[in-house]
Amino acid sequence: MQIKTAEFLTTSPDVRKCPQTNALEYAFIGRSNVGKSSLINMLTGRRALAKTSSLPGKTLLINHFVVNTTTKSFQIVDLPGYGYAKRSKKEQEKLRKMIADYILLRQQLTCLFILIDIRLEMQKIDLEFINWAGEHGVPLVIVFTKADKVGVMKRQANISQWMKKLSEYWEQLPPHFVTSAETSQGRDELLQYIDSINPSVSVETSVENAEANED
């Protein structure tokens, strides 16, 4: 699958304000500072499509991007990161509700990509989030990020730890990919996966609906 264009569409404060289009949505989420924006930029081939920041927890809203290929149109959705402890309890609860409402209520959500920093050993909050999504029947994929920042042995050990732990909860393990925004590792594999679960959707129809929603 080759991406022709990728553009910012809109920002939504909650799922009820999300654009009413027929475009399938592929949402990306992870702990704060996991490299989510960098991964989205790498996938789309647009360096500044999703705003990156050295400060964790900068994404506070639901960001929608329209992606067009030669035959299909879909949306990439950048969700706020979870697990940023420096927020007030009220802000944390607001973000948790925003994230949960989108994941559980958004009919256009086709797949949830959960990002994991491959440099780190398994984090409890990531495991709990993956299992929560699985328990609610959400189609999901695990994406290990920052593969260029760690040696092969450490990378393989961390992935093995994850697969072993998940097998305690999952009868069938979710798909997983290893990526690097710096080297574009995993880009082709991720795009091929998205293409494989993305049925033919009219580019014209999706774009027209998105524009009508903006008007």
Where are the regions that the model predicts?
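Conserved G1/Walker A P-loop phosphate-binding module
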Residues: 1-86, 203-215
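Canonical P-loop GTPase G-domain recognition
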Residues: 3-16, 150-207
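Short, well-ordered secondary-structure micro-motifs
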Residues: 19, 87-88, 123-126, 153-155, ...
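Hydrophobic aliphatic residues
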Residues: 43-44, 103, 194
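Conserved nucleotide-binding/hydrolysis micro-motifs of P-loop NTPases
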Residues: 58, 81-83, 119-121, 146-151, ...
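Amphipathic alpha-helical transducer elements in NTP-driven molecular machines
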Residues: 59, 92-96, 127, 184-187
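Conserved nucleotide-sensing/catalytic segment adjacent to the nucleotide-binding pocket
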Residues: 69-109
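Conserved C-terminal guanine-recognition region of P-loop GTPase G domains, centered on the G4
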Residues: 97-173
